[in-house]
Every structure is written in C-alpha cells, then in structure tokens.
Amino acid sequence: MAKVLCFLATNPQCVQPLREEVEMAIDEHGWTREGIAQMRRVDSFIKETLRFEGTTACVYFLRTPLMYLTSLLDGVQRKATKDVTLSDGTFLPRGTNVAFAVYAIEHDHHNYEDPFTFKPFRFVELQDKCGDPSKYQFASITHDSLGFGLGKSAW
C-alpha cells in the first residue's frame, strides 16, 4: 500500500476521480462486496501501481543498469517440494528453485501497450474494450499479471 500512496501523491490528478468513485459506490452500496466491485478505478490504480513498480523489493529501486538486471532476475520464487515434470517435458527434481521474472513479464510490450508508462486507469480501459468489468481486476490472475499469486502459495 505504501507504493500505492506514493503513486497517488505523485499523480494528484487521480485523487478527484478516485474520491468521486469511492463516494458514489459507498453512497449506493455501502461498504459491501457490491460497493467495492463498483470501485473499478481504485482497482485499476492499485493494479497498475504494482504492475509498474512490481511486487519485489529490487524493482522499487530501479536506478542503475545493474539493478535493472537484478530486477529482471528477481521475482516470484518457489522451491519444488517434489519431483515435477512440466508439460513441455522439463524435469525439475525436488529442491529445485524456480523463479518468474515478474518485472520482465509486466513490462513486456507484448503484454502491455506502452509498458514503461504509468497509466493509472489502464485496466478500466481494457475492461471497457472487452466489455467485461470483471476481467483485468486486481484479484484476477493471468499469464501477464501475476498479482500476489494463486492458491495456497499466494503472498
């Protein structure tokens, strides 16, 4: 949440639309699941902040080429608790460390248009284009937006 507040402070033009959305949702639905579901801009702002800055510590301090390289190698890490064979035939013996380069995935131009630009309402625009307000929500997990993981291994 600290990153979200920092981005809100550095993007003051977003404060009013976010405030209006929250007030309208609460007036209409109160602090309920339905009310929170109406806060699409808030959801998009949070998701875009985490996409742009990442959820790993190194990404936040990207200032040098070495730190950039480190962030590409850093990401979601897990250790295989048993022998695993992946769908492509790759064998991972028990104890193998596996990592996903979250920053690289979330800044790939194949996954996001203009990935190095912070667009606070990027995901609202994507929802409007596809016509599905539940798609691209922060809580949804896709190959290009890992959020906090999935299942019992979620952060």
Q: For each of these PLM feature ranges, what is it?
A:
Residues 1-23, 49:
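Central I-helix of cytochrome P450 enzymes
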Residues 21-25, 65-66, 81-82, 113-125:
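Active/binding-pocket-proximal capping segment
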Residues 137-155:
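Cytochrome P450 heme-iron axial ligand motif
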Residues 61-64, 69, 80, 101-104, ...:
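Active-site proximal loops enriched in glycine and acidic residues that flank catalytic Cys/His/Asp
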Residues 1-5, 45, 101, 149-150:
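Short, hydrophobic/aromatic alpha-helical segments in well-folded domains
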Residues 100-136, 148:
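Conserved cytochrome P450 K-helix/beta-meander segment immediately N-terminal to the heme-binding cysteine loop
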Residues 18, 22, 49, 92-98, ...:
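Structural signal for hydrophobic/aromatic residues that build the beta-strand cores
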